[in-house]
Amino acid sequence: MNATVVIDCSALVRALTDHGPAGFAVRDRLGGLDALAAPGLLDYEIVSALFGMVRGGKLTEREAVKGIADYQSLAITRHETLILWQRVRELHHNVSAYDAQYVALAEALGVPLVTSDARIQRSGAAKCSIEVFS
């Protein structure tokens, strides 16, 4: 098992809010790692996702606040990804520009990407290992 992974918003939201088997599986995968890495945009995506789940009735306000507090306690190394723009441009034909940031970072670091978005793996565009938890 690698000591570091890049984690995307979908997997992290699952880890923070899902009390079922999929959430447990992500938390289990992340346990014992030396480090988590992500593009700097993760902060914005997490807040947007959690508040969106409140608006959609999938989380209570209290659960969202707890999720943000739990997120803030995680040791995540945030990376600027503008330097990866050329790879992001290549990837954006197959995945969203947001997802391309995570893929390009995982490729640059030579570590797996942990996600709950199977479309990233199905795209076949990534040159890194993709671990899907859904």
Name the predicted role of every residue range.
Residues 14-16, 49, 123-124:
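Residues that scaffold the ATP/ADP-binding catalytic core of kinase and kinase-like folds
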Residues 1-42, 53-62, 118:
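Short, well-structured N-terminal submotif of metal-dependent ribonuclease cores
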Residues 1-4, 91, 103-134:
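Acidic, PIN/NYN-like endoribonuclease modules and their adjacent C-terminal/linker elements
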Residues 41, 47-75, 87:
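Active-site-proximal, substrate-binding regions of enzyme catalytic domains
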Residues 35, 77, 129-131:
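Conserved beta-strand segments of alpha/beta enzyme cores
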Residues 74-116:
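Active-site neighborhoods of divalent-metal-dependent phosphate/nucleic-acid chemistry enzymes
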Residues 10, 45, 101-104, 119:
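Active-site phosphate/pyrophosphate-handling residues
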